[in-house]
């Protein structure tokens, strides 16, 4: 594997503004804010131009100068090591130019998916709809996590490193029917005053507007606390795109992810 340099954590904060004028997934800011564990590799410690940033759970982002051949070798080698150890490898590309570079490097080993990134339009915020009788909305805590089927302890261990880390730094809301968690909207990632939303509703409770209600509460919390809500999804996920539009999000860009499995 070609040797690139892992940047020291004291350099993380200075990198955040480098991604402000282009697409950058929220998990990158989570790493740079040191909200979750991760690593930043670059072609130079002092004046980095190419970046490979990843979570411990196997989600990565590549950005910067596409012409560095050593960087190409590093990506190929890193991917091969992940495959050998049967670890997750999900790579977010920052541009179409990077796509053209990555395809020959990764060959045909990985699946590809086009995704859309959305921007929230604050003026379009609407009041919460009334929940159906018998349902209540609460902020997610460790007790709710212990009763959840979708956003359970394994979920937070994967994306937040631990339930306690999420409880300390993250937030989310759930609709409950008794002790039954039926719909949730949580911050899968949080960084640089951005919170990426992840939503799930049990199949038997869909069609009741619960996802809209719980997402609306999530957005309201963001507005109250100076946080920008973030929404990304597969471009073929029509129900997610429709819900995003209803909540006040507009598509700003599309990008490609490469993933194993």
Curated annotation (Swiss-Prot):
Residues 135-261 form the N-acetyltransferase domain. This is Uncharacterized N-acetyltransferase YdfB. The keyword Transferase applies. PROSITE patterns: GNAT. Gene3D superfamilies: 3.40.630.30. It comes from the Bacteria. It comes from Bacillus subtilis (strain 168). Belongs to the acetyltransferase family. The keyword GTP-binding does not apply. GO terms for molecular function: acyltransferase activity, transferring groups other than amino-acyl groups. Keywords: Acyltransferase, Transferase. Pfam families: GNAT_acetyltran. The gene is ydfB. Its EC number is 2.3.1.-.
